[in-house]
């Protein structure tokens, strides 16, 4: 197995650069959605969370490349990213006051006791889904020095163009000497929303992206559904089964 060489961080502008969607997550706590009157708002994103936690927990120099919308929700997202200490490279979109483009929205009821957690989305006309090849000046971004580049399967599932952008960014990262990682993060709801062939297309799309990565992250479901690898039935064992 080849040794993974992480570039020295002395002169690098970013220890990690993430590419993905920024979303607002509405959380009613332990109250079911149908009974909740209030929700806590969190700024999140499968790829962004890596950058935010490295910055907040370890003081690392991180950044996010994403889409932002010029309306109050977008301003709230900007503030949260800034407060986390994450630098941002934004493609800016203007909201038309009615239809968008919008910042994606995730609803997450954490469940309680025997009631399982529930997650669903409102990602209609999402700004991040409009991103594609050419959206970012990778030469300028990586020119400042980036040690590690990261993206994920949630962003890849948003549109036909986001996987192409991920591949473009990975190639630029590799050319700049950065380590490249990809979190498969298979989400059946997102791929199914792409149409009846969505789940089948996931393996082809994620497989092509995975070929560009030095590090692949995922669990059994990600590997089977996201890459089409053979394995035991995903639902065949309890989540608590140590085997």
Regions found by a protein language model. Give the residues of each.
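Conserved phosphate/ATP/ADP-binding segment of small-molecule kinases
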Residues: 189-243
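Short pre-catalytic strand/loop immediately N-terminal to key active-site residues, enriched for Gly-Thr
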Residues: 35-44
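Alpha-helix C-terminal capping segments
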Residues: 42, 49-61, 83
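A short helix->loop->beta-strand "cap" motif at the edges of active sites that frequently abuts
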Residues: 175-179
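Conserved N-terminal subdomain of the carbohydrate kinase-like
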Residues: 61-153
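Positively charged, low-complexity intrinsically disordered leader regions
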Residues: 1-33
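Hydrophobic faces of well-ordered beta-strands that scaffold small-molecule active sites
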Residues: 64, 180-182, 216
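Short, well-ordered alpha-helix to beta-strand connector turns
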Residues: 13, 145-146, 213
């Amino acid at each position: 197995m080849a040794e993974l060489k992480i570039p020295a961080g002395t002169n690098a502008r970013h220890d990690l650069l993430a590419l993905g969607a920024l979303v607002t997550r509405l959380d009613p706590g332990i109250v079911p959605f149908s009974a909740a009157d209030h929700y806590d708002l969190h700024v999140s994103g499968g790829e962004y969370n890596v950058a935010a936690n490295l910055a907040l927990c370890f003081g690392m120099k991180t950044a996010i490349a994403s889409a932002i919308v010029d309306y109050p929700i977008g301003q709230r997202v900007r503030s949260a990213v800034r407060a986390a200490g994450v630098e941002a490279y934004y493609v800016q979109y203007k909201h038309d006051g009615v239809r968008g483009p919008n910042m994606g929205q995730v609803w997450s009821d954490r469940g309680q006791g025997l009631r399982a957690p529930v997650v669903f989305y409102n990602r209609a006309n999402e700004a991040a889904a409009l991103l594609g090849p050419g959206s970012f000046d990778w030469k300028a971004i990586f020119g400042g020095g980036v040690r590690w580049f990261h993206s994920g399967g949630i962003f890849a599932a948003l549109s036909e163009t986001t996987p192409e952008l991920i591949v473009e960014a990975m190639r630029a990262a590799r050319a700049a000497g950065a380590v490249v990682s990809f979190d498969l993060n298979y989400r059946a709801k997102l791929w199914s929303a792409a149409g009846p062939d969505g789940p089948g297309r996931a393996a082809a799309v994620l497989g092509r992206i995975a070929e560009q990565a030095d590090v692949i992250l995922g669990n059994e479901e990600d590997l089977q559904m996201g890459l089409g690898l053979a394995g035991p039935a995903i639902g065949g064992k309890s989540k608590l089964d140590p085997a």
